[in-house]
Structures are given as C-alpha cells and as structure tokens.
A protein has these predicted regions:
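Structured non-transmembrane domains adjacent to transmembrane bundles in polytopic membrane proteins
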Residues: 45-65, 70-162, 378, 384-547, ...
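Membrane-embedded transmembrane helical bundles of large multi-pass transporters/channels
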Residues: 1-35, 41, 136-381, 497-696
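Surface-exposed, low-hydrophobicity interaction/linker segments
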Residues: 35-38, 102-104
C-alpha cells in the first residue's frame, strides 16, 4: 500500500490536472442525465397494473391521464377552453361534457346523474379528463401539463399523478442546488471548528465534490435516475465518505510526528494506512447499498447503484485527489492551523468502561420499546398528499374532492371491448354499489337506457373502445394508499373479473396498492441481505465469529431507536424510510464501529488488560467518531430543514438524527458490550489473545 502512496505523491500534479479535466465530461454527463419524477414507474413491469398501462398506451395511444377542474366558468367558455386543451401537443384526447353529448343536445333531456359527473351546479365547477399520448413521467407529458396551464391562463386545476410529477420536478429543480450548498457550508463550519485547520475543510470539500461530480456525471450511462436519487446522492456521498478524508488527514499528521519530517514520505505512509483501514469499512458501506439492488421495486436499484458507485469514487478521490491537494497547498495549510478544541477523552473513556453496567441496563431497557416503535411507526405511500398546499396539483386535488362528491382519485378498468351492454351495465351497477365509490361508468352505462349509444360521436366511442379493450372509469372517495381504497380495489377487481377474466384495474390508486405489497416484501429482503453481507465482511475483516454479531446488534439497536422515535412522536414517515435509513445508517455506523474495534484488537494483542484495551480504543476513537458523526449530521440536517419535498426532508432528518444516535451507541453501548463479552471475543477471534501474560 505504501508503494501506491509513493506513486500518488510522485504524480500529484498530473493527478490534479487529470482530476480537473475529468470534471468537463462529468458536468456534461450530469446535465444530460434524465431525471424520473414518477415513483410508480419503478414498479415491476410484469404486474397487472403496469401491463395495463402498456395496453392503454399501445391500444389507445393514451399513457398518462389527468382530471381537470374549471371553477366558475359558463358552458360556452368551458367548450372553448376544451378546444384549446385539445390543441396542445401530446394531448391525445379530452373527455368532457360537450365532447360526450355535443353542443346541440339540450342538457335538460340528460339524466341528472350523468350531468353530475361533469358539472356541479351549486359551485359552478366543471370537470373534464385529459389523456396524454405518453407516460406519466415523460418529458412530453410534463411539457403538455405546463402548456395546458399556460393556454388556459391558469384557469384550470389539474389533478392526478402527471400534475404531481410536473410540480415535483419544478420544485426539486429549484431546491436541489441549495441542498448541496447548505450541506457543504454546514460541514465546513463543523470541520473548521472541530479540526485543527481552517483551510483543510475546503480541500475536503473540493476532493469530495469532485468525486460527487464524477458520480453524478457517470449516471449518464444509466440512462436516467430518480429525482430522489439525484437529490440525495450528493448529500449522502458527502456524509458517508467524509470519514475517509478525516482518516487520511489524521494519518498524515501522525506520520509527520512519528516517522519523519519529510512531508512526501509522511503522505505516502498516510495513503497506505488509509487504504488499509478504509477498504474494509468502505466495502461494508458498498455492501449495504448493493443490498438495495435486490428490491423488485427498482428505485432500490437506482439508489443502490448510484450510492455504491459514489462510495468507490469517494475512496479513490480520498487517496489520490485529496493527498495531491494537501501536498500542493501544504504551506497554506500550515499557516491556517489552530489549536484543536476537542479535549483528551482518556478519562471519559475510562469512566464509561468502569460504568459499563449502566449503559448495558439502558441498552436492555430501550431495546424493547425501540423494536416496538420501529415495527409500528406509520408510513405514507401517497406522495402527493405531502406536497405544499400552494402547488397547483395540491389545490386541484382539494377542488376535485370538494366539488365532485368527495372524489379523491379516479382509476380505470380495462375490459373486453366485446363485453355486452348488459354485462357492462351490470358490472358498473355492482361497482357503484360499493362503499366509497363516487361513480363508475362505461360507455354503455353512462347514458343508461334514456339515450341510445348511437347518439354518441364516433370519435368518443373510439377513444374509449378499442379492438380488444374498452376503458371504464371509477371515481373513489377514499384516500390513495388507505386500507379502505386497497380493499375497494380488491372488490372492484373481483367484480370486473367476474364479467371478464382478463380485465385489469389500473391507475394511480391500484399502482400504489401494488407498491405497498411489493415494498413490504422488498424491505424484509434488503434488510436480511444487508445484515448478512455486512456480517460476513466484518467476519473477514476482523477475523472473528462473535464480533460481527456484536457490531451488527449494536448498530441495529441504533437503527431501531432512530426509526422507532416517529411512533412515539406521532410522526408519519415516507414508506421507503426504513430500508433507505437502515441501509445508510448501517453502512455509515459500521465505519465508527470498525475503527474502535480495530484499535481494541491491537491493544488486546499488545498485552493490555480487558478494560485498559477498551479504554484506550475508546479514548483514541471518540474524537474521530464525534467529528465524523457531526459531519454527517451537518450534511443532512440542513437539507431536512429546507426541503419542501417531504420525502427528501424526512429522509434527511432521519439520517441526521441517526448519525447522532449511532455516535452515542458506538461511544457508550458498544464498549460496554466489549466489557461484557471480552472473554467470548478473544476466544472466537484471531489476533486478540495477549502476546504475553496480562490481567484479564
């Protein structure tokens, strides 16, 4: 490893030149990487709801759809508005009152129930549906949503997933640069205070920043990334890989003091030591992210690949770019050195070790409530419900519910186009009889027997009936992702299949129901895979059977406490929190744990007694653990405070709190477990037994 360090030191200038040149293609790649704002897009392609979406697109030329509420406009002006909307690029069709019956049919002869589908006479609100010719999250659909708003002078409110995706994109694009800025500023403040140089945080940020740009730029080769991945990747990479930079700096200072005054030689030694120490902890972090790739909900694959790649690039940057920067600006660094405010922790470490029984009791007392809270914390799946109320899509959902019989969402049934009018009417009657249904209608049932179907325009019939399938609309009063709507969808699906075995229930609500079912299974798989992977990595790194169990148990305890707190505070968190936070907190905390355990092993092997070895390991590790944890906290806490997208804000808040909880667990609980289980550890591990007789 030292040979590699010498090569880096020798080639430091070419390394810096190359690293800056690589920023050019990386920046180009970053700006040309498409971002996907639709969470439901990541559902498996082989489930009914996703196959139904494909049929809708292939057979009807319709992908996304939206419900539009127009407030306080007369019928004539609504008709003009509809014609404007029909002229927007990528609008496949519009289904409206005038489109169904034409302008020549007197409204008085229409059934009151039919009119109520489109008009609320009391409030003056009018409803019509827009179908787009591309998928929910496509660039064309999002442009069409915005253009519809523009051509109607924002006189309409567009509800549905397409509108949510469009507004989320607008908001995320404005805020994401501020996430990075806030994270960098706060981390620099923490490092400037707790480290011994005012300038070194700048070089940390420059080195890590380059690795982040390389990572985000290389996402171009993935085709596209989720907006969640894009928003979190930079902040997470900063928080997770900061440890490596801190370790290199400390190793460099130690090498200068202990081995030589030759800064080049000291850096070569520091690079070698950093690689040796960081490889094990970085592999565990990468393993945690790779575990996300085992999800059938492929957002896990998206986030897992990007973050694993980011950790690898972070390690490479830490042992190439950062040493080159430090040596190049060594004199400037010397001039900005200041006294460390971090005290000596030898006495606190001895006190913790001598009073380990206190922390073991706390550990046991908190474990049960933490696990219970973790298993019972409420989560939400309907992302639109957490967006700011000022957004057009949020106002539209409210208008839809207030003006049209409490309607919260509209989904569809794809049924056989040759289904008889009798069966179609019977199916719709059964669906309309279910609790929580505002209306269910097909072409055959819409006008009942009072107006013959032949009176409908051929263009409308062709919009709703294809060669193989026909579209039936179902409006629900229930909230998306609620138990009530999921039960309702099951009943609607059963009714539809009674009349047509090949029918499918599709739309946002059915997709969200599938999301709940699939991710529940996925999260259990990821949790098991990540724990097993990290268990075996710790086993090989520390050459121990017992230590993987002890370390994983301590870290999982920290995760249970973090994820259990929302239950006791009555906070509802995003559905993906448990797997993302669990993976990240596990991967980040294991760095602290391995750092202290490695020193404990070295001191035990050197002949120190149990308590002396643990005290030395703890006392020397506490400063690094505190700085690293506070750095991660700073990187995520600020983003959690400013993010308007609740999913991003919640995830960052959980990560920030998790960093602090993990810090306390590693400082207080882990050494206490070492004290309790020292005999087990030294008899089930290689390299722990004292080389000479000493008191245990």
């Amino acid at each position: 490893m030292k040979k590699f360090g010498k090569v880096v030191v020798k080639l430091r200038i070419p390394i810096l030149v190359l690293s800056f040149l690589l920023l050019i293609p990386s920046v180009l790649g970053y700006f040309n990487t498409r971002v996907n704002y639709d969470i439901l897009y990541y559902l498996p392609s082989d489930i009914d709801t996703m196959q139904g979406q494909d049929i809708l697109l292939d057979d009807f030329g319709k992908g996304a759809y939206a419900m539009v509420v127009v407030d306080g406009m007369n019928k004539s002006n609504v008709s003009k508005l509809v014609k404007k909307v029909e002229g927007v690029d990528h609008v496949a069709s519009v289904i409206s009152y005038s489109g169904v019956v034409g302008d020549d049919v007197p409204s008085e002869i229409l059934p009151d129930k039919f009119r109520s589908y489109f008009e609320n006479e009391d409030s003056g609100a009018t409803l019509f549906a827009i179908f787009f010719d591309d998928t929910t999250s496509s660039d064309d659909t999002m442009k069409a949503i915005q253009e519809v708003r523009d051509v109607t002078d924002n006189q309409c409110y567009i509800a549905g997933m397409s509108a949510v995706v469009t507004d989320t994109k607008t908001m995320a694009e404005k805020e994401t640069p501020f996430y990075v800025l806030v994270a960098v500023v706060l981390v620099c403040i923490v490092l400037a205070i707790f480290m011994d140089s005012f300038l070194v945080p700048v070089f940390f940020m420059l080195s890590i920043g380059m690795a982040i740009v390389y990572n985000l730029g290389s996402n171009y080769f993935l085709g596209e990334v989720s907006y969640i991945t894009k928003a979190l990747a930079a902040v997470l990479q900063l928080g997770v890989t900061l440890d490596y930079s801190i370790f290199l700096w400390h190793s460099y200072k130690e090498a200068k003091e202990e081995t030589t005054d030759d800064h080049h030689e000291a850096m070569a030694v520091a690079i070698g030591n950093t690689l040796t120490s960081v490889v094990g902890s970085s592999i565990t972090t990468v393993a945690g992210f790779i575990a996300l790739c085992f999800m059938s909900f492929t957002l896990g694959l998206d986030l897992g690949v990007v973050m694993a790649k980011g950790v690898v690039l972070g390690v490479i940057g830490c042992v190439t770019i950062l040493p080159s920067l430090i040596l190049t600006f060594d004199k400037a660094l010397e001039k900005t050195m200041h006294r460390e405010i971090m005290p000596n922790f030898d006495k606190p470490a001895r006190w913790i070790v001598n009073h380990s029984w206190i922390f073991l009791i706390i550990f046991v007392l908190l474990l049960g409530p933490a696990i219970y809270g973790y298993n019972n914390t409420k989560v939400y799946y309907d992302l639109s419900d957490t967006l700011p109320e000022k957004l057009n899509c949020s106002q539209a959902n409210k208008m839809l519910a207030e003006n049209f019989d409490g309607t919260n969402s509209i989904y569809m049934i794809l049924a056989d186009s040759n289904l008889s009018a009798e069966d179609s009417n019977a199916m719709m009657n059964e669906v309309n009889g279910l609790d929580g249904i505002s209306f269910a209608l097909s072409i055959d049932s819409a006008l009942g027997g009072e107006i013959p179907t032949e009176m409908l325009p051929d263009s409308l019939v062709s919009e709703l009936k294809g060669d193989e399938y026909q579209i039936m609309m179902v409006s629900t009063n229930y909230t998306i992702a609620s138990d009530e709507i999921n039960d309702q969808i099951n009943k609607v699906d059963a009714i539809a299949k009674k009349y047509d075995a090949k029918s499918m229930v599709i739309g946002e609500a059915p997709c969200t129901k599938d999301l709940i079912t699939i991710t529940d299974k996925d999260f259990k798989t990821v949790s098991a895979v990540s724990i097993v992977a990290i268990f075996f990595i710790i086993f090989f790194v520390l050459k121990s059977i017992s230590l993987p169990v002890i370390l994983v148990a301590a870290i999982e305890f920290a995760i249970f406490v973090n994820m259990g707190i929302p239950y006791y505070t009555g906070t509802t968190i995003p559905f993906i929190s448990s797997v993302v936070i669990g993976t990240i907190q596990l991967g980040a905390t294991v760095d602290y744990a391995i750092l202290m355990t490695t020193r404990y092993k070295r001191e035990r092997a050197a002949g120190n007694s149990k308590k002396e070895a643990i005290s030395i390991a703890l006392g020397t590790s506490i400063p690094s653990i505190i700085v690293s944890a506070l750095g991660f906290f700073a990187a995520t806490f600020g983003v959690g405070m400013i993010a308007s997208v609740d999913m991003i804000a919640s995830l960052c808040t959980l990560m920030a709190r998790g960093a602090i909880i993990s810090m306390f667990v590693v400082i207080f609980v882990l050494p206490s477990l070492f004290v309790l289980l020292d005999k087990v550890i030294i008899h089930t591990s290689l390299g722990f037994k004292p080389k000479k007789n000493s008191q245990n």
